Amino acid sequence: MKLTCMMIVAVLFLTAWTFVTADDSGNGLENLFSKAHHEMKNPEASNLNKRCAPFLHPCTFFFPNCCNSYCVQFICL
């Protein structure tokens, strides 16, 4: 019983250690928190306020803004 508990604790510790020490080249959490803080100060900067293009409306390949579809040849499909 004690060995099982020790194994569970060891696995949980190693899993947490893997996530903590993982190489995040984009500083994901740091960028996430700073972005959230910026959106609280400026609500217009939130992604929820951005509009998307409906089906068969124009879009750009590099910055697609289609709602629930893909941008194919500058049209939301």
UniProtKB/Swiss-Prot annotation:
Localisation per UniProt entry? Secreted
Q: In which tissues is it expressed?
A: Expressed by the venom duct.
Q: Which organism is it from?
A: Conus textile (Cloth-of-gold cone)
The Swiss-Prot or TrEMBL note on domains reads: The presence of a 'disulfide through disulfide knot' structurally defines this protein as a knottin.
Alphabetized, the UniProt keywords read:
Amidation, Cleavage on pair of basic residues, Disulfide bond, Knottin, Neurotoxin, Secreted, Signal, Toxin
Lineage of origin = Eukaryota, Metazoa, Spiralia, Lophotrochozoa, Mollusca
Q: What is this protein called?
A: Conotoxin King-Kong 2
Residues that make up the propeptide are: 23-49
Per the UniProt entry, the signal peptide is: 1-22
Transmembrane region(s): none
Return one GO MF term: toxin activity
Give the record's family classification.
Answer: Belongs to the conotoxin O1 superfamily.
